[in-house]
Amino acid sequence: MEVKQIYTLINSVTGEILGKSDILKEDLSNVVDMGKELFSNTDVDNYVKSLVNRVGKTVFVNRKYSGKVPSVLMDAWEFGSVLQKISADLPSATENESWELVNGTSYDPNVFYKPTVSAKFYNSKVTFEVPLSFTEKQVKESFNSASELNAFISMLYNAVEKSMTVKTDSLIMRTINNMIAQTVDGDTMGVRAVNLLKNYNTLKGLSGANVLTANKALTDPEFLKYASMQIALYADRLGTMSTLFNQGGKERFTPKDMLHIVLLSDYAQATKTYLESDTFNNELVKLPTAETVPYWQGSGTSFDFSKTSKINVTISKKNGSSNTKDVTVSGVIGVMFDRDALGVSNLDRRVTTNYNPKAEFFSNWYKFDCGYFNDLNENFVVFYIADTTSGGGGA
């Protein structure tokens, strides 16, 4: 082990923290060990210079990761592959002839009124697997005890679990992203794809140099008040039967216990910092209870809002159609949707194992099958902020 003398450095540090000298440039390269992958020929004792240093403590990077995505998991089933979803349209009202009686008129009670019922079938899955091989005999020589070996193996299993969590979480977010793109692409009226910034500027009569821009919106308390109000209004509106909030034009309502609200962390934290913290009655401007996500598609290389709020995807134009369309949406700050609008169904996780007796190792294949679906006949609303001069949120 290399031992370095740092008395000169520590004396100058003492002077700095006691206020006896100004801030000096400190050479910390001799203080902080950055680690290395393997031992070198200098890793010997400082007495006879030939005894190899021993590992005194082993720390395994074995932290569990639970993920951070909205909960849209549904049930699974063993037999059959198709998810069938059946719905009925609202029947129309007719004349109540009880109050229109005419002498000598026959009133036929035997008319058949056929209900209008439709069914959707979801019959697709996605799949992947994570393979990993394990040895026992070959790796024993690197540890001092069975407990250390078990901790090492446990770390490998945990690495697989973390890998599976990251991958399944990303697919859940892609299910939401696809619905965002479908909604923005299919809404020309701004009812389901709501550009809060455009609506705010219109409401306030702002134009030209006075218009509020997307890069300043999340630090503007007045805009944040307006956005919070609109999101709360939509949460109430979706509880009332309407055809406006789903692309299929179906009569739908979403009760509070079946309403999902997912907000981008940038927006949720901006509301807390710039709005709620400076308001005496913050309950009046507080956002509805919601889940938060740090990004929709990815963080980019900087976690900048322009990256975290953006999705860039290719969507299928119609159910079962091979026609596709590229859609880019920027400035997405939140979504609100019915429990049945999207989901993850028939999830099947399993492990298959094979032992190789010749080379004395075994391999596990961690397999994953699942069905992800969007239903455009259910309520789904997107909230975004985009400068109107840039052409809105979709492309």
Positions of the model-derived regions?
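Extended, compositionally biased alpha-helical segments that mediate assembly or anchoring
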Residues: 1-62, 277-395
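Alpha-helix boundary/N-cap detector
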Residues: 1-5, 35-47, 147, 151, ...
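Assembly/oligomerization interface modules of large self-assembling protein complexes
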Residues: 48-132
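Short glycine-rich, low-complexity/disordered patches
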Residues: 64-72, 169, 176-177, 181, ...
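Long, contiguous amphipathic alpha-helices that act as assembly "spine/axial" helices in icosahedral shell
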Residues: 118-192, 360-366
